[in-house]
Amino acid sequence: MELRSQEVRTLAPENDPLKMGMGWKVDDLSKPQILVESTFGDSHPGSAHLDQFVREAVQAVNENGGKAARYFATDMCDGIAQGHDGINYSLPHRDAIVNLVEAQANASVYDGGVFIASCDKSVPAMLMSIGRLKDMSAIVVTGGVMEAHTLPKEYVVNDPACAINELLTLEQIGKFDAWEKTGVIPNSQLDYYKHNACPSCGACSFMGTASTMQIMAEALGLMLPGTALMPATAPELKQAAYDAGKQLMELVKKGITAKDIVTKKSFENAIMVHAAISGSTNATMHLPAVAHEFGIEIDADTFDRMHRGAHYLLNIRPSGDWPAQYFYYAGGVPRVMEEIKSMLHLDVMTVTGKTLGENLEELKKNGFYEHCDAILAEKTAGFARPVSREDIIHSFDNAKGTDGSIAILKGNLAPEGCVIKHTACPKNMFEATLRAKPYDSEEECISAVLHGEVKPGDAIFIRYEGPRGSGMPEMFYTGEAICADPKLASSVALITDGRFSGASRGPVIGHVSPEAAVGGPIALVEPDDLIQIDVHNRKLAIVGVKGEPKTPEEMDAILAERRANWKPKAPKYTKGLLKLYSQHAVSPMKGAYME
């Protein structure tokens, strides 16, 4: 076992005394040095509790022949940053965390790492960091998912979009806020929902980006089986953190590094799982960015290809009925993988030191599924009818859908592509021709929606919100305002070069590429252009002007004339992180990472 940490001790005589100044003992200096990196901090519920898992991992490393060192790269919260310019930092700060972790790991030189995170950008950041440090042994621990709040009868509302109205989760707050603004519910009722939507720490309890990326970490083989998206309050999660630290030491001793585990096949497995869970559209950026760090090239088109014909199984919000905490009760990632086993590469290596196929067989033998069934029965004992795991994770033969959940659309409006989560889109909008109503900021657009200026049959555009424009913030509130209006929810499309929250529902199309800031066709859209959406044929195109259809050749000529008159906007940012990101970010179709 060759240790890089021991090589540098001979190069810098100050190395040993500086570590002993932190309380290290002489015999600690010759042990494998292990980085325990987390996003712990008081920034949001997904990170505020991570210190307990750090302690467990540190203890496990120290008790199993290593010496652990804690490092922190606290992340921001998309939810807390919503509604103001803070949301522009969301995607750029993913890359900022990666750069910080790279510096921390390489400046001191570690032999392995335990990486602990929970949420939208922090989990992808840790996965990207592992890719950048791929010659090191690595394992991931995620902070689990928060509880849902059980509503008293007087606060239960009959929402036809959800069959389980008694359980409150955070992604519903945007809709309730829109209802309060339009007089559907009183302010006191909104306050109750706001004060009870996050009853514990953990990632938000729906299949948004945080939950999706926790699952992706396990699907890539970087987590212990069955430990992704556990309830944050479950005692098993602390045990999982300890077990991860212990297993990391086994990987170090055997010389198994991250690059031995994560391969092209691993990413293909993750994308198949993504299809089965109807995962967040943001994964179409994050997984290519992670793959890039590993020297593996995948892009959004890979998702489209692999989602076609894939079985979609998960009945979890926002594309289903149940809060995300029930995912673990129904068997978690192993149950999903067991159902789609015929579609997976079972020979890939994982952090257990065994293959995925061996892990799945072992779980069946050690009572994992019986344990989950018992917890599900306990957690749903007071419900009106018995709840089975098939209510939450459907079987392969009884899938909710058989065409995955993500589609990449292309056409003269998005030559490089754009993304739609079709499992959250009304079927009548799969083929539609709408009138364009473009806005150059979300603030203008949401005001128009709330003041009744948007009508059925409109295609709303929010542009100059891509990576090079403003850092690619979420367009969450506009989407929720549309979904909260019954007249608009299935008759209006929202199209943007920005992105959406993993909680977004409805006919929302994001990541339009090339983006407006670099002169993409979305910058050329004018009011009353005719916009064709065709999900089945993967098409998004401008097919007419001023309400009149045009031939493809006529549209090419019209767009060429508009392009000749288009002038780029001045850079929005002139200093700091947002300037760096907007200058160096690649297309969302490739991962929106900085190059």
Q: What function would you assign to each model-found segment?
A:
Residues A105-M126, A138-T142:
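A short, small-residue-rich loop immediately preceding and capping a beta-strand
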Residues M1-G46, F53-A73, G79, D85-S90, ...:
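Catalytic or ion-coupling anion/metal-binding cores of large enzyme and transporter domains
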Residues S90-R94, V98:
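Well-ordered mid-protein domain cores that form the structural environment of catalytic cofactors
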